[in-house]
Design a protein with these regions (language model features):
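Conserved FAD/dinucleotide-binding core of flavoprotein oxidoreductases
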Residues: 1-54
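A short, flexible beta-alpha/helix-coil linker loop
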Residues: 19-23, 80-82, 137-138, 262-263
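Helical substrate-recognition/capping region of FAD-dependent monooxygenase/halogenase enzymes
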Residues: 37-41, 108-304
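Short FAD-binding loop at a beta-strand-to-alpha-helix junction that anchors the flavin cofactor
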Residues: 69-84
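Active-site flanking residues adjacent to catalytic metal/cofactor-binding acidic residues
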Residues: 76-77, 95, 221
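Glycine-rich phosphate/pyrophosphate-binding beta-alpha loops
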Residues: 81-91, 144
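Functional cores that coordinate and move charged inorganic groups
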Residues: 91-104
Length: 304
């Protein structure tokens, strides 16, 4: 493949892509002769070049750090993973930062539960490994001109005609298809997933899950007027927000949404208080630390 385009300062950017690149490091200097030879192989003809100001090479770089956290050292973005130029993983550096930021803030504020920072590696390393697999698949689809490679590409063209498949692949590329493992038995199917952007009807007007997340705070979203769940969560205020709302397509009675928009816990439709309340308090404890101290009737402080 040969590509070129105009640069803002008036120059031209040219590049070639070959299915069988030389076994050289990206740091190995490229000579003008090498580039002209590559153009000849790709185009089948010589292309006269004027003054060349910069030459570089890049290959299929798909790699990931073994650990995203080692004590006080934390890796994110390109320091944690590198993906080839296929579009997959374009959001992953931002998602690393969003996952890590609220956990660091919790540690600094002093309410982080034990092991909270370790979940950054557990969750984002898993997500990065999936992205690496996807980039390798995309590169495999782009390479090769033999009948087997063409058949594979044709199969994917047919699959992409299906809207559901297209949405799934779009979520893979965006990085929102990840389901993080959540602590506790019998978790709802939504637990660990990226919160759906529901349209919400509240006493203050119409809003959405995405708008609620602008504050980057944990939210207990009560979708079924569950006073028992709201009362159970009050011991964690003002650390978390509690929002009651109605929606046309209710996926659960309530959602506990982390600041990174992943669901920490969900109450099944009609789930009794006997199981929902202790499960909610367990999730709040696991992700947002001990409940705030409350004062008993004698004036002594106790934990809620």
């Amino acid at each position: 493949m040969f590509g070129f385009g105009s640069l803002a300062h008036g120059g031209l950017l040219m590049q070639t892509t070959e299915d069988e690149p030389a076994d050289l490091s990206d740091d190995t200097p490229m000579t003008l002769t090498e580039f002209q030879d590559s153009i000849r192989r790709v185009l089948g003809a010589d292309l006269p070049l004027g003054d060349v100001t910069r030459l570089s090479r890049y290959g299929f770089q798909a790699r990931q750090a073994e650990r995203y956290r080692d004590g006080r050292i934390l890796l994110a973005g390109d320091a944690a993973h590198q993906f080839p130029a296929t579009g997959i993983g374009i959001n992953f550096g931002m998602l690393d930062a969003v996952n890590l930021a609220w956990k660091l803030a919790a540690v600094i504020a002093g309410w982080a539960p034990a092991g909270l920072l370790d979940t950054y590696h557990d969750e984002r390393h898993f997500a990065g490994a999936r992205a690496l697999l996807q980039t390798q698949a995309q590169v495999a689809l782009r390479r090769g001109q033999d009948p087997a490679a063409e058949a594979l590409r044709e199969l994917f063209r047919q699959l992409l005609a299906d809207e559901q498949t297209l949405r799934r692949l779009g979520a893979l590329i965006a990085g929102t298809s990840i389901r993080y493992p959540m602590p506790g038995p019998g978790q709802h199917a939504l637990a660990g997933t990226f919160a759906p952007d529901l349209t919400l009807h509240t006493d203050q007007g119409i809003t959405s899950v995405a708008e609620l997340m602008h504050a980057a705070r944990p939210v207990l979203l009560d979708l079924a007027d569950r006073r028992d769940l709201r009362e159970a969560a009050r011991d964690w205020q003002p650390r978390i927000d509690i929002q009651t709302a109605r929606t046309d397509h209710r996926p659960a009675d309530a959602l506990l949404v982390r600041p990174d928009a992943h669901i920490a816990w969900a109450a099944a439709t009609g789930e009794p208080a006997g199981t929902a309340v202790p499960a909610l308090r367990g999730a709040l404890w696991s992700w947002f630390g001990l409940p705030r101290p409350v004062q008993n009737r004698s004036g002594a402080l106790e934990r809620g």
